[in-house]
């Protein structure tokens, strides 16, 4: 296990992604370095009211402490009483154009140590796409990039992590997926550190190729008030998932993380409506019938 090596990679990944996104948007991200009083800190890179991105954040954090919050030890009682160290890059991008999908990507490393005992460590991460108006070619492209990221580690990873993503990014109280998925993994520590690190690194390294071509293709499509209205309504689902179900959000808030950085994933303009559903056969209804289905996208390619 080499924590310093992972941290160096994550800092570099954040810089590469922010630079790539600045080239697409034409506006700069605000870089905000912060310290965590209990140990650690990070850098939040945020764009608001950009040319393409209405709001977006690319966050690096490295936190450590003497004990873990309840959200971490509930599922893993063996971690109770151990010191911890965690580092990760997490991003969410909300484009202004409703035809351009929201995207989330995260790669992280966690280690818990205790004197006289072997360290407990694991990697986690993934990326997933949340369209408002879906395009099959975008879904295929995104899932192919996810598969390409995992292919060097073995054929078995993509189907496993794709299924995991569909199950994780699911709003149980709505009985619907958050988006069209991608890949998701957690607790990855087999067969060894180097293999797990390589896999996680490949996911991070494939992000720009997975998302930027879609953003470029959709950023200038004409839209009106109707599309913006539906986008704001569907963004409500994003808020619901992040605040009710997302383990990373809960861990961050319970472990004394930086609230501004944790909640930068939330969209800037959102609407809720009582008991609303789109008209049958409408472009808005197509999102539900054709895209929010947990289907396998790659045979289409």
Curated annotation (Swiss-Prot):
A divalent metal cation binds at residues 94, 104, 143, 173. Keywords: Cytoplasm, Heme biosynthesis, Metal-binding, Oxidoreductase, Porphyrin biosynthesis. Pathway: Porphyrin-containing compound metabolism; protoporphyrin-IX biosynthesis; protoporphyrinogen-IX from coproporphyrinogen-III (O2 route): step 1/1. Its cofactor is a divalent metal cation. It catalyses: coproporphyrinogen III + O2 + 2 H(+) = protoporphyrinogen IX + 2 CO2 + 2 H2O. The record marks 173 as: Important for dimerization. GO terms for biological process: protoporphyrinogen IX biosynthetic process. It is found in: Cytoplasm. Belongs to the aerobic coproporphyrinogen-III oxidase family. This is Oxygen-dependent coproporphyrinogen-III oxidase. It comes from Nitrosomonas europaea (strain ATCC 19718 / CIP 103999 / KCTC 2705 / NBRC 14298).
């Amino acid at each position: 296990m080499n924590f310093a090596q992972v941290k160096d990679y994550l800092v570099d990944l954040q810089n590469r992604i922010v630079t790539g996104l600045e080239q697409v948007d034409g506006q700069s991200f605000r870089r905000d370095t912060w310290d965590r009083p209990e140990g650690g800190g990070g850098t939040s890179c945020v764009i608001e009211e950009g040319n393409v991105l209405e709001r977006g954040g690319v966050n690096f954090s490295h936190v450590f402490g003497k004990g873990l919050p309840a959200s971490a030890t509930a599922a893993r009682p063996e971690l109770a009483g151990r010191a911890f160290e965690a580092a990760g890059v997490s991003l969410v991008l909300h484009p202004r154009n409703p035809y351009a999908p929201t995207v989330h990507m995260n790669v992280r490393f966690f280690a818990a140590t205790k004197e006289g005992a072997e360290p407990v460590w694991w990697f986690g991460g993934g990326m997933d796409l949340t369209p408002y108006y879906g395009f099959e070619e975008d879904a295929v492209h995104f899932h192919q990039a996810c598969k390409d990221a995992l292919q060097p580690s073995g054929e078995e990873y993509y189907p496993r992590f794709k299924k995991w993503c569909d199950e994780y990014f699911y709003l149980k109280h709505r009985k619907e997926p958050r988006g069209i998925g991608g890949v998701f993994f957690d607790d990855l520590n087999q067969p060894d550190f180097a293999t797990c690190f390589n896999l996680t690194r490949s996911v991070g390294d494939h992000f720009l190729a997975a998302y930027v071509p879609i953003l470029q293709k959709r950023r200038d499509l004409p839209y009106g008030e109707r599309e913006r209205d539906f986008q704001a309504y569907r963004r409500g689902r994003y808020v619901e998932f992040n605040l009710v179900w997302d383990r990373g959000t809960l861990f961050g808030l319970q472990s004394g993380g930086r609230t501004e950085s944790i909640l930068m994933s939330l969209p800037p303009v959102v609407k809720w409506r009582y008991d609303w559903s789109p008209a049958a056969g409408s472009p808005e209804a197509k999102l539900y019938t054709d895209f929010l289905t947990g289907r396998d996208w790659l045979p289409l390619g």
